[in-house]
């Protein structure tokens, strides 16, 4: 069995990993912790035309990569504490699309993700979670 855990570094994401780990530690599953952030091009567009090829964009891109690695490493640590071995995957692009791409190419049995990652969202499910639920070809466990 292969499980894809998704994290954006939020407390809710970590709680989803923790809650699921306690349920699946007897399955001896292979686990991957995926963290997705904006692509280099998107960072440039967000910062504006004058920053697209600047040092600011490169520095921002490095900071994003560092944070994504930290988020995924935290997820792996939670899983290891529950006796589950996991590997880290980092992706850059539109978050839901990258989760769906990894789910399909990695031959996972199901996806685990938090209901929403951003605090203050008034909806029951966040936009990324809604998109993954609508388009995933495998079960999605939402915590």
Language model regions located:
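A short acidic, glycine-rich active-site loop
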Residues: 53-70
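Structural beta-alpha unit
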Residues: 77-111
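Conserved beta-strand positions in the Rossmann-like core of class I SAM-dependent methyltransferases
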Residues: 32, 87, 141
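Small/aliphatic-rich secondary-structure junction motif
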Residues: 2-55, 84
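Glycine-rich, Arg-bearing micro-motifs that act as flexible, cationic patches
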Residues: 110-134
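Short, hinge-like loop/turn segments at secondary-structure boundaries
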Residues: 48-52, 105-107, 129-131
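Conserved acidic residues
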Residues: 1, 109, 137
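Absolute protein N-terminus
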Residues: 1-2, 143
């Amino acid at each position: 069995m292969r499980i894809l855990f998704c994290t954006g570094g939020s407390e809710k994401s970590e709680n989803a990993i923790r809650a699921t780990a306690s349920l699946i530690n007897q399955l001896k599953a292979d686990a991957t912790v995926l963290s997705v952030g904006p692509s280099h091009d998107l960072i440039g567009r967000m910062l504006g035309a004058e920053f697209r090829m600047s040092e600011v964009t490169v520095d921002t891109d490095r900071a994003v990569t560092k944070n994504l690695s930290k988020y995924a490493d935290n997820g792996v640590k939670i899983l290891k504490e529950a006796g589950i071995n996991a590997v880290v995957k980092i992706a850059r692009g539109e978050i839901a699309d990258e989760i769906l791409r990894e789910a399909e190419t990695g031959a996972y049995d199901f996806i685990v993700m938090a209901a929403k990652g951003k605090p203050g969202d008034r909806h029951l499910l966040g936009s990324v979670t809604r998109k993954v639920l609508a388009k995933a070809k495998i079960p999605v466990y939402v915590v």
